[in-house]
Regions:
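Short glycine-enriched loops at secondary-structure junctions
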Residues: 12-14, 66-67
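His/Asp/Glu-enriched, well-ordered alpha-helical/loop segment
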Residues: 22, 27, 31-35, 39-121, ...
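Short acidic, glycine/serine/threonine-rich loops at helix termini
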Residues: 20, 72-75, 131-132, 147
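Active-site-adjacent beta->alpha loops and helix N-cap segments on the catalytic face
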Residues: 13-24
Length: 162
């Protein structure tokens, strides 16, 4: 009737209604590391939730629940893989699923005609210690130099002279 595009966030109790949720085709946003039930509505919290939802055919998007922890989102996706989620489904939870759910169909994947935003990683992007080697935004390489990297380079040179 109202043509709403619904998205559910949290859904720690999703295992209780997994069949109904899958049939509804409503995407969910979860924190894959939120496994401590700290309220009544989170009693079913589990590290396996990401895999359970994804394996049931539910579109999963990841968040960190707190903006100051956003740097942990890749680690959360990695934890989801460690607890049974398919690796490519976890990557999609950070990219393609997000773009599709929010109506950005020309983003989120490496496809001809899409915006050319891409990060090339030195190793597995779901490993917390991994850093991007290159980032391209709209097809243009971004400078990854930071104050920290300049300081590192400066002091490494001083150590090398000794």
């Amino acid at each position: 009737k109202y043509k709403l595009n619904m998205i559910l966030a949290g859904v720690e109790d999703a295992p209780l209604v997994i069949d109904e949720l899958a049939a509804s085709e409503i995407p969910v946003i979860i924190n894959p590391m939120d496994n401590i039930p700290d309220s009544f509505d989170e009693l079913s919290s589990s590290l396996e939730l990401s895999a359970l939802l994804s394996n049931a055919g539910i579109t999963v998007l990841f968040d960190t629940s707190r903006s100051h922890n956003y740097h942990l989102i890749r680690q959360g996706a990695g934890n989801a893989v460690a607890y049974g989620m398919d690796y490519l489904d976890a990557i999609a939870g950070l990219s393609t699923n997000v773009a599709n759910v929010f109506g950005l169909k020309d983003r989120g994947s490496i496809t001809k005609g899409h915006y050319a935003d891409i990060a090339i990683w030195e190793s597995d992007p779901l490993e917390p210690a991994s850093i991007p080697s290159y980032i391209f935004i709209n097809g243009i390489e971004s400078d990854l130099t930071t104050r920290s990297s300049r300081l590192k380079d400066r002091y490494i040179k001083k150590l090398d002279k000794k």
